[in-house]
Amino acid sequence: IQKKEDFDIQTRFGTFRMRAYLQTTNKQVHIALTKGTWNAGESVLTRINTTQVNNDILGTLTDNNDKKLDDIFRKINEVEKGAIIFINQEVKSLELLDRIAELKVLQSQGEMRAPQIKMDTKDFGIGAQILHDLDITKIELLSNSTAPTKRVGMIGYGLEITDYVNY
């Protein structure tokens, strides 16, 4: 990855530092928003979002994505430091068709939510590179899951989850 932009940005959640990274293998752009500072080796509140930055129409139609983002930013603002990484996934037509088919099943079950965008295993490597650039190796993982998921591959990237924080 290559860091292409690095500047402070005013958001509805306050001032954050925005970094944009270009993935050289496929020209995808990933975004990191950070607040505050930390020392090397310090555990940092972190959320890693897999998203389709340019085209998540299903999420827009069915989810309250703003509510989820509000909760994530609120948590980071509470502790006055943290990172939110947006891993941008390439939109492929067949994957979109698969998500539409899954949406149909969810709707038939009365669920008003979009199917999750599944994180590609390659995304862990990209996320790890971004985290290392941010000098984050110990993570307090922001998650909306009630049961912590084992992230087996993270140790191989020199990352450690020290805690799971619900938002």
Task: Annotate each predicted stretch with a short phrase.
Residues I1-Y167:
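Catalytic domains of riboflavin
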